[in-house]
């Protein structure tokens, strides 16, 4: 039997000839090497970043759900007897949404917003849609991005957390602030989604005998469409994609205004909504065929 072969004729591996203690010391030394320590820190940093991303995704979902509920509430204005009561309730709901956005701002404090933008963009777009819908109902105008950004500036009083360490004598109390700035793309996509809600509001208002709202909405949508037309295909892909949906909403509202102007006296008010819904379905079918 060869001296290099162990019992049973199996050839010994080279590392089997090393003493056991020597192998353990080599393993411990490799774990404490600068390279291993560097990769260990990279692992911890990536794990922390992934955990933060998941928390932001969850907050974005909550913001989306609460914003949609606010939009559904605002649609009741066309049939509700007390408009102010619904506006007050919608404001309290939007305050709750802003508390969620405050948590997002706290998570992103000291971080690069663009690294986590994909996690929160859906919720921010839905919030823009809800707050701009409420603003249009109140003022018949479009809320600016600067106004929304002002609403997304928070202090320690907004979060309900006061600083536990009192300021020293002669030092003024520093006010902790958190800001979350919308990107222009988030704002534009939220406004583009708003046009679909305004189209539904137009049809619902006609069904309740409100003849003025469709013409106000039509004029507003034309201005929004003209603004988006200046961007055209030069802007982000998502914006140019929304432009087609915006054009559809404008066509449906203009069709409703045309029917009101030309045939409004022929059709009873309680049947107007049914006529418009049939015509919008016909428009959808024609566009799908083309």
Swiss-Prot record:
Binding site residues for Mg(2+): 129, 197
Molecular function via GO: A2A adenosine receptor binding; metal ion binding; protein-containing complex binding; sequence-specific DNA binding; single-stranded DNA binding
Subcellular location: Cytoplasm, Perinuclear region; Golgi apparatus; Nucleus
Signal peptide: none
Gene3D superfamilies, per database record: Translin, domain 1 (1.20.58.190), Translin, domain 2 (1.20.58.200)
Region described as Disordered: 1-31
Keywords: Cytoplasm, Developmental protein, Differentiation, DNA-binding, Golgi apparatus, Isopeptide bond, Magnesium, Metal-binding, Nucleus, Spermatogenesis, Ubl conjugation
Ranges of compositional bias, category Basic and acidic residues: 16-28
GO cellular component: cytoplasm; endoribonuclease complex; Golgi apparatus; nucleoplasm; perinuclear region of cytoplasm
Tissue: Detected in heart, brain, lung, liver, kidney and testis.
Family: Belongs to the translin family.
Quaternary data: Ring-shaped heterooctamer of six TSN and two TSNAX subunits. Interacts with GOLGA3, TSNAXIP1, SUN1 and AKAP9. Interacts with the homodimeric form of C1D following gamma-radiation. Interacts with TSN and C1D in a mutually exclusive manner.
General function of this protein: Acts in combination with TSN as an endonuclease involved in the activation of the RNA-induced silencing complex (RISC). Possible role in spermatogenesis.
Protein name from the UniProt record: Translin-associated protein X
Native species: Mus musculus (Mouse)
Lineage summary: Eukaryota, Metazoa, Chordata, Craniata, Vertebrata
Gene that encodes it: Tsnax
